[in-house]
Design a protein with these regions (language model features):
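Membrane-embedded segments
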Residues: 53-133, 138, 150
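Gly/Ala-rich beta-loop-alpha elbow adjacent to hydrolase catalytic centers
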Residues: 143-148
Length: 151
């Protein structure tokens, strides 16, 4: 009986250890090719490079707002990348909204590996960019999908 319990405990500890080692791969599912906004069907947008506080350059897509319109900041979900959310930007662009599709480290051809702190840094870089464009917080609409709700 003691041998069976010891075996079960060893198996359990092995499983816990394997999950600990693999947790990042289980948590983040980066993907999506690195395409241009035009190739993705949103020629109104342009690729911007955002420098994060840890020095990484992360690509995002941006279209400025028409006069008096707010800017939608879209933080995408776990699977895929900004290229997979291009169709979600089209209606807002059509109505003159500014749109920023936020890219993340390790997603869509961006350098780095995703992590909680890294994604926060990516989000902070987005906010800093909006400041440089003169877009006040009152004119920003933050939208998060899945993983993006935490950024």
């Amino acid at each position: 009986m003691t041998g069976i319990l010891a075996g079960l405990l060893a198996a359990y500890m092995g499983l816990v250890g394997a999950l600990y080692v693999a947790q990042r791969h289980l948590m983040y599912h980066p993907g999506g090719p690195s395409l241009s906004p035009t190739a993705a069907g949103v020629p109104e947008m342009r690729t911007i490079e955002l420098k994060t506080r840890d020095g990484l350059l992360v690509s995002s897509w941006y279209a400025p707002p028409k006069s008096g319109q707010p800017t939608l900041v879209y933080f995408h979900g776990n699977a895929g990348a900004i290229v997979d959310r291009a169709e979600k930007a089209r209606p807002y662009l059509h109505h003159g909204y500014g749109v920023l599709l936020a890219g993340y480290r390790g997603y869509g051809g961006n350098p780095g590996s995703p992590s909680e702190q890294g994604l926060y840094a990516d989000g902070e870089a987005v906010i800093e960019f909006l400041k440089t464009q003169g877009i006040l917080p009152a004119a920003q609409i933050m939208y998060g999908e899945s993983l993006g709700t935490g950024i």
